[in-house]
C-alpha cells in the first residue's frame, strides 16, 4: 500500500527534505485509524518505519511497553517519543506542532 501513496507528496508539492525525524508507527492492516494516520504521514512526505502487528500478541506487548501501556493502534513514535495515536497526530498537525516535530533530528545514541 505504501507504493500506492508515494505520489501524494509530489501532488501536494511537499518535499521530504525538511523531515529529519525518525518516525515509527505500529499498525493493523485493516485499521481505519492506522490508514488515516499513514495517509497524513505520506501526505507530508514522511518516510516511516511501520510495524504491522496484526494478530501478533508478542509484538503488541512490545508496543504497549513502549507506549506507556497503551494497546490501541496506531501508536506513533517520533524520535522514540510516543505521541499517541491518529487523533493525537492530527491534533499536533492542526495546532502547527507536527511539522516542527518532524523537522527535529533524532538524538544521537
Curated annotation (Swiss-Prot):
Xref: Gene3D superfamilies: Glutaredoxin
Pfam family, one: Glutaredoxin
Species per Swiss-Prot/TrEMBL record: Synechocystis sp. (strain ATCC 27184 / PCC 6803 / Kazusa)
GO function term, MF aspect, one: glutathione disulfide oxidoreductase activity
Similarity section: Belongs to the glutaredoxin family.
GO cellular component: cytoplasm
PROSITE patterns in the cross-refs: GLUTAREDOXIN_1, GLUTAREDOXIN_2
Domain spans labelled Glutaredoxin: 11-109
Record GO biological process: cell redox homeostasis; cellular response to oxidative stress
UniProt key word RNA-binding: no
Record-given protein name: Probable glutaredoxin slr1562
Keywords: Disulfide bond, Electron transport, Redox-active center, Transport
Amino acid at each position: 500500500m505504501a507504493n500506492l501513496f508515494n505520489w501524494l507528496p509530489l501532488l501536494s508539492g511537499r518535499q521530504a527534505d525538511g523531515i529529519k525525524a525518525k518516525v515509527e508507527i505500529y499498525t493493523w492492516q485493516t485499521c481505519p485509524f492506522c490508514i488515516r494516520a499513514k495517509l497524513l504521514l505520506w501526505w507530508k512526505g514522511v518516510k516511516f518505519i511501520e510495524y504491522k502487528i496484526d494478530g501478533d500478541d508478542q509484538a503488541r506487548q512490545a508496543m504497549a511497553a513502549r507506549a506507556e501501556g497503551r494497546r490501541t493502534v496506531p501508536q506513533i513514535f517520533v524520535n522514540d517519543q510516543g505521541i499517541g495515536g491518529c487523533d493525537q497526530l492530527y491534533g499536533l498537525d492542526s495546532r502547527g506542532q507536527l511539522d516542527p516535530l518532524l523537522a527535529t533530528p533524532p538524538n544521537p545514541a
